[in-house]
């Protein structure tokens, strides 16, 4: 609608002027993106804003809330799983360290539910690695449980579990730069986790 277009332009102008969004505004924007209310150019503009300035805690929290509210929930809590995550896009052209770590931990008998995506800024996103190893992405809870029981690991391909991440994936890939979605990824595993250490944890 015309009113909606005006609102979206107003939001972008505010961001271009280095103003910050409130938590509820951030949540609404990501919900609208998932519902297809923003076109590719508008999404690219939004991503670019956060390359020009730091994202605020309130904005990040709002985006995270939207992703968690829209997620396809996965209950594997009986396994008390962990996820080992990184933000990706370090520009070092290294192998995918966090995904390799998941194999090691699962091989040692600990239960891992890895949540990841194709690389937007590299060739070795978690989904790229898993696909190369013959993993078939699924949202079927019975198949995920069988994977946990037999291998101590299940893989959640992000676009299958969140419409917003699916909507922005081609734009992120086209831009080829780190964005706030790199920060959000480790925070929005759709499975209820026992714990989620990251490579930067002092532990």
Residue ranges and their predicted role:
Residues 1-7, 194-203:
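Single conserved hydrophobic/aromatic residue that forms the stacking wall/gate
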Residues 4, 8-93, 108:
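Acidic, glycine/proline-rich low-complexity segments that act as flexible tails and inter-domain linkers
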Residues 47, 95-151:
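A glycine-rich phosphate/pyrophosphate-binding beta-strand-loop-alpha-helix module
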Residues 83-84, 112-116, 137-140, 155-157, ...:
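General beta-strand structural signal in soluble alpha/beta enzymes
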Residues 86-91, 116-122, 161:
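Acidic, glycine-rich active-site loops and adjacent beta-strand->loop/helix elements
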Residues 143-196:
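Phosphate/diphosphate-binding glycine-rich loops and adjacent basic-rich segments that engage nucleotide
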């Amino acid at each position: 609608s015309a009113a909606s277009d005006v609102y979206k332009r107003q939001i972008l102008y505010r961001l271009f002027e280095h103003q910050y969004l409130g938590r509820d505004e951030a949540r609404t924007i990501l919900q609208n993106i998932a519902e297809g209310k923003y076109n590719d150019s508008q999404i690219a503009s939004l991503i670019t804003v956060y390359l020009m300035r730091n994202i605020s805690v309130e904005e990040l929290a709002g985006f995270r809330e939207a992703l968690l509210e829209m997620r396809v929930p996965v209950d594997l809590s009986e396994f008390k799983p962990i996820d080992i995550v990184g933000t990706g896009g370090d520009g070092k052209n290294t192998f995918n360290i966090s995904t390799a770590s998941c194999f090691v931990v699962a091989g040692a008998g600990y239960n891992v539910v890895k949540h990841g995506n194709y690389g937007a800024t590299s060739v070795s996103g978690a989904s790229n690695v898993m696909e190369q190893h013959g993993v078939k992405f699924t949202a079927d809870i019975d198949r995920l449980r069988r994977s946990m029981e037999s291998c101590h690991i299940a893989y959640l391909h992000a676009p299958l579990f969140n419409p917003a991440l699916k909507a922005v994936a081609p734009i992120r890939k086209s831009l080829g730069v780190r964005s706030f979605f790199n920060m959000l990824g480790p925070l929005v595993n759709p499975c209820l986790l026992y714990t989620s250490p990251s490579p930067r944890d002092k532990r």
